[in-house]
Amino acid sequence: MVRAARRKRASEDDLSRGCRAGQDCPIDIKNKYEQNTLADRILKWVSSFLYFGTLGISSGKGTGGATGYTPIGGGGVRGGKGANVVRPTVLVDALGPTGVPIDPVTPDEALVPLLESSGGSTTLDVPPGGEIEVIAEVHPPPAAGDPEITIGHPEEPPILEVIPETHPTTRVRTTVSKHDNPAFTAYVASAQLPGETSASDNVFILHGFNGEYVGPAQTGEDTVFEEIELENFGVPESPPSSSTPNTSFRNILNKFQRRLYNRRLVQQVKITDRTFLTKPSKLVSWEFDNPTYTDDSLSLIFQQDVDEVSAAPMAEFQDIVTLSRPVVYEREGLVRVSRLGQRGTIRTRSGLRIGGHVHYYTDISPIRPVEDIEMRTLGEVSGDSVIMQPLAESTFVDSGDVLNEGNIEFPDSTLEDDYNEDFSRARLEITTSARSRTSIVTVQEGIPPGSVKLFINDAETIVTPHGPESNDTDRYQPFIPVTPAATPDIIITFEEGTATFFLHPSLLKRHKHKHWFF
């Protein structure tokens, strides 16, 4: 048995073209190209209440729509670019549009009527709204052969008239500047008086010193010049309302204050802790900073992780990311210090932190109004003088009265001295003739083994004790020279260049000598 040969079926595109031409069409090809397959019918039924967008669920290509399929968790895939179109290197003439209709026109004679004229100028009379008549002069054509040129008589030389070319004139603008030095140039001005020719000129010499007028320029009835009162230009009529001028920095500060006190966008928080003025970073996070490298006058940036929740030292500074530099200004009669902070409560996948703005402020001290400040008078404006006494009240003395000896009288008892001199803490000063130096020795009572006795290494030195004065002449002690008669208990030796003393050998403490026997 011979098996029949299996022939290959034509492609789907060829079969579809045959179907459109009227050939027999397989049912599957017809349903596919007419979008009548089972999948197409299901999609049409379900699309009445569901929308699949551009997923491309049909019998077409599985390309995923216009943008293609996008994998989950990844970005889109760009399609490949088409082939580059090679442009020709030669110039291509642009062709006009085809099918432009051409309207036929009735042929007329292309003849211009010419009128003969006896010469002269040609006049064109154009009637309004009528045709233009052109009048031209017609000359006979030249005869055949070489033309004959005749220039005057043969004996005369030819004359050629040359007309020079005219060039357009160029505009030239010239400016002159003159600068005079008033130190070396004299300004001369004549008196402009009608009918006067004998008036002398006035010369003004302008230099660094005061000038002198030469000529009839005296004040009075014979004044030549007109005196014009000088006016000041550019001077404000009223002084500024405040001592602080309105500068650009003031405008920036006002704009910054309006931004801080916007309650719809910025949260207002008042801080009473004084650490906010010196170390605001301690209120945000628990950290130890080196004061050598920390400057609180700048903006502060805090590195915090949103995933790791940590409590701030102060609840008002929770989740603060940045703190601006401090701003000091006046607000409602108080000196206020403000800082603008931003929270970082939310973090996106891209790493961006989102949070609201917080305005932290604290008041330092009130500002007293100008009326409450007591002003002092500079200088004396009246005839009264004020004498200030620290131990008594102030006394007003009329300076108009002349003070003399007759007006001031004091009793003799005012000049008496009621104080008794006490020399219980007196010091004994001894002056030697070696270098004229004064040595001060403090005499203390009760030094064992007796009173202090002085040993002076100068025989000419005289010690003069002074006691309280008394009217009793018997108790008066004359000058007595001091000479050591016996060895004193304590010897004080004054040597040159030293201020120490040495004890007598008899007063030194004795040491026990231990004998060692071997």
UniProtKB/Swiss-Prot annotation:
One of its GO terms (biological process) is symbiont entry into host cell. Highly phosphorylated. GO terms for molecular function: DNA binding; structural molecule activity. The keyword DNA-binding applies. InterPro entries: Late_L2. Its main location: virion. Pfam families: Late_protein_L2. GO terms for cellular component: host cell; host cell endosome; host cell Golgi apparatus; host cell nucleus; viral capsid. Disulfide bonds join 19-25. It is found in: Virion; Host nucleus; Host early endosome; Host Golgi apparatus. A motif (Nuclear localization signal) lies at residues 1-10, 509-514. Keywords: Capsid protein, Cytoplasmic inwards viral transport, Disulfide bond, DNA-binding, Host endosome, Host Golgi apparatus, Host nucleus, Host-virus interaction, Late protein, Microtubular inwards viral transport, Phosphoprotein, Viral penetration into host nucleus, Virion, Virus entry into host cell. Belongs to the papillomaviridae L2 protein family. Interacts with major capsid protein L1. Interacts with E2; this interaction inhibits E2 transcriptional activity but not the DNA replication function E2. Interacts with host GADD45GIP1. Interacts with host HSPA8; this interaction is required for L2 nuclear translocation. Interacts with host importins KPNB2 and KPNB3. Forms a complex with importin alpha2-beta1 heterodimers via interaction with the importin alpha2 adapter. Interacts with host DYNLT1; this interaction is essential for virus intracellular transport during entry. Minor protein of the capsid that localizes along the inner surface of the virion, within the central cavities beneath the L1 pentamers. Plays a role in capsid stabilization through interaction with the major capsid protein L1. Once the virion enters the host cell, L2 escorts the genomic DNA into the nucleus by promoting escape from the endosomal compartments and traffic through the host Golgi network. This is Minor capsid protein L2. It comes from Bovine papillomavirus type 3. The gene is L2.
